[in-house]
Amino acid sequence: MNQSPPGIIFNIQRFTIHDGPGLRTELFLKGCPLRCEWCSNPESFMPYAQVGVYKTKCISYKKCAACEETCPQENILQFTRGKLTSIERHDCTNCLACHNACPSDAIKLWGKSMSVEECMEEIRKDKGYYERSGGGVTVSGGEPLLQSEFVAKLFQACRSEGIQTCLESSLYVPWKKVQNVLPYTDLIISDIKHMDPEIHKKYTKVSNDKILKNLIKLTAEKRNIILRIPVIPNVNDDMVNIESTADFILNELGGKIRTLQLLSFMRLGEEKYTALGLPYKMKNVKVNRRSFQKHIQMLAEYFNQRGIHCVVGTKEK
């Protein structure tokens, strides 16, 4: 097998059950061209390793100061009441010296370079569980197809060992990158965030045109696809958008999807935004969980009435 560039991975989760069938090992790759306001993984945005600051874990400047002593830049580490609270990101060279010096995990590293074989060593640990549960490997992100060459080689390695593969992708990439991985991909999970290109751009910073075109191409190739809608209050949960989404699935995709999954908005990841010095734009969004779940269930019933197999959550039944 030809050598591929290493993958930049920020998390590997074992025994996941939400992104594909059975028990799975899920790899999360760095880098994403979208900036969805509700994203729970802001550490996935940038395509390189970076650090986050967790001030509650800081020992204190007086007792330690290892980060300050090793940082090659001057005055970019910000301390409040003796504890590290933030980093001036525009002056940071991302050398990771502060993380390497920190003895208390107050400076957390997100992103690690891993070869295909290093990933396979992790994946093989649970091969027996995949076989018994009908599971396998899922690669997510971020946008994993920004590292499509790595994903293709990883999926080739999985296939050679009889391990099922699943790709979770926004599909906001050139079609060529999708084609790179298709021969080795058993299942694709993607989502439709909004049908209106301007509203889509308002909340994700990109248009939906490329995404929808790639979905059409995938269904034309008779690919195994699970579609999702992250249901965000007052963003995409109105009937105008829901009806437009159903029309697209039926008319443009020919209804050729395995399942449509509606995922309820959850306020997750706020602590990570703070650690990265980023604003969390959903901070003031308040949801009555019971009434919102009823609303989502009503939306699922609408899709099912239109002949689209739809469920609430990540299961398929």
Swiss-Prot record:
<dbReference type="GO" id="GO:0051539">
    <property type="term" value="F:4 iron, 4 sulfur cluster binding"/>
</dbReference>
<dbReference type="InterPro" id="IPR040074">
    <property type="entry name" value="BssD/PflA/YjjW"/>
</dbReference>
<keyword id="KW-0408">Iron</keyword>
<feature type="binding site">
    <location>
        <position position="95"/>
    </location>
    <ligand>
        <name>[4Fe-4S] cluster 3</name>
    </ligand>
</feature>
<comment type="pathway">
    <text>Organosulfur degradation; alkanesulfonate degradation.</text>
</comment>
<feature type="binding site">
    <location>
        <position position="142"/>
    </location>
    <ligand>
        <name>S-adenosyl-L-methionine</name>
    </ligand>
</feature>
<dbReference type="InterPro" id="IPR012839">
    <property type="entry name" value="Organic_radical_activase"/>
</dbReference>
<feature type="binding site">
    <location>
        <position position="71"/>
    </location>
    <ligand>
        <name>[4Fe-4S] cluster 3</name>
    </ligand>
</feature>
<keyword id="KW-0560">Oxidoreductase</keyword>
<feature type="domain" description="4Fe-4S ferredoxin-type 1">
    <location>
        <begin position="49"/>
        <end position="82"/>
    </location>
</feature>
<feature type="binding site">
    <location>
        <position position="64"/>
    </location>
    <ligand>
        <name>[4Fe-4S] cluster 2</name>
    </ligand>
</feature>
<feature type="domain" description="Radical SAM core">
    <location>
        <begin position="18"/>
        <end position="306"/>
    </location>
</feature>
<keyword id="KW-0677">Repeat</keyword>
<keyword id="KW-0411">Iron-sulfur</keyword>
<feature type="binding site">
    <location>
        <position position="58"/>
    </location>
    <ligand>
        <name>[4Fe-4S] cluster 2</name>
    </ligand>
</feature>
<dbReference type="InterPro" id="IPR001989">
    <property type="entry name" value="Radical_activat_CS"/>
</dbReference>
<feature type="binding site">
    <location>
        <begin position="191"/>
        <end position="193"/>
    </location>
    <ligand>
        <name>S-adenosyl-L-methionine</name>
    </ligand>
</feature>
<feature type="binding site">
    <location>
        <position position="32"/>
    </location>
    <ligand>
        <name>[4Fe-4S] cluster 1</name>
    </ligand>
</feature>
<feature type="binding site">
    <location>
        <begin position="38"/>
        <end position="40"/>
    </location>
    <ligand>
        <name>S-adenosyl-L-methionine</name>
    </ligand>
</feature>
<dbReference type="InterPro" id="IPR007197">
    <property type="entry name" value="rSAM"/>
</dbReference>
<dbReference type="InterPro" id="IPR017896">
    <property type="entry name" value="4Fe4S_Fe-S-bd"/>
</dbReference>
<dbReference type="GO" id="GO:0016491">
    <property type="term" value="F:oxidoreductase activity"/>
</dbReference>
<feature type="binding site">
    <location>
        <position position="39"/>
    </location>
    <ligand>
        <name>[4Fe-4S] cluster 1</name>
    </ligand>
</feature>
<keyword id="KW-0004">4Fe-4S</keyword>
<protein>
    <recommendedName>
        <fullName>(2S)-3-sulfopropanediol dehydratase activating enzyme</fullName>
        <ecNumber>1.97.1.-</ecNumber>
    </recommendedName>
</protein>
<dbReference type="Pfam" id="PF13353">
    <property type="entry name" value="Fer4_12"/>
</dbReference>
<dbReference type="InterPro" id="IPR034457">
    <property type="entry name" value="Organic_radical-activating"/>
</dbReference>
<dbReference type="GO" id="GO:0046306">
    <property type="term" value="P:alkanesulfonate catabolic process"/>
</dbReference>
<dbReference type="Pfam" id="PF04055">
    <property type="entry name" value="Radical_SAM"/>
</dbReference>
<comment type="similarity">
    <text>Belongs to the organic radical-activating enzymes family.</text>
</comment>
<feature type="domain" description="4Fe-4S ferredoxin-type 2">
    <location>
        <begin position="83"/>
        <end position="112"/>
    </location>
</feature>
<feature type="binding site">
    <location>
        <position position="36"/>
    </location>
    <ligand>
        <name>[4Fe-4S] cluster 1</name>
    </ligand>
</feature>
<keyword id="KW-0949">S-adenosyl-L-methionine</keyword>
<feature type="binding site">
    <location>
        <position position="98"/>
    </location>
    <ligand>
        <name>[4Fe-4S] cluster 3</name>
    </ligand>
</feature>
<dbReference type="InterPro" id="IPR017900">
    <property type="entry name" value="4Fe4S_Fe_S_CS"/>
</dbReference>
<dbReference type="InterPro" id="IPR013785">
    <property type="entry name" value="Aldolase_TIM"/>
</dbReference>
<feature type="binding site">
    <location>
        <position position="92"/>
    </location>
    <ligand>
        <name>[4Fe-4S] cluster 3</name>
    </ligand>
</feature>
<feature type="binding site">
    <location>
        <position position="102"/>
    </location>
    <ligand>
        <name>[4Fe-4S] cluster 2</name>
    </ligand>
</feature>
<comment type="function">
    <text>Involved in the degradation of the organosulfur compound 2(S)-dihydroxypropanesulfonate (DHPS). Catalyzes activation of the (2S)-3-sulfopropanediol dehydratase HpfG under anaerobic conditions by generation of an organic free radical on a glycine residue.</text>
</comment>
<feature type="binding site">
    <location>
        <position position="67"/>
    </location>
    <ligand>
        <name>[4Fe-4S] cluster 2</name>
    </ligand>
</feature>
<keyword id="KW-0479">Metal-binding</keyword>
<dbReference type="GO" id="GO:0046872">
    <property type="term" value="F:metal ion binding"/>
</dbReference>
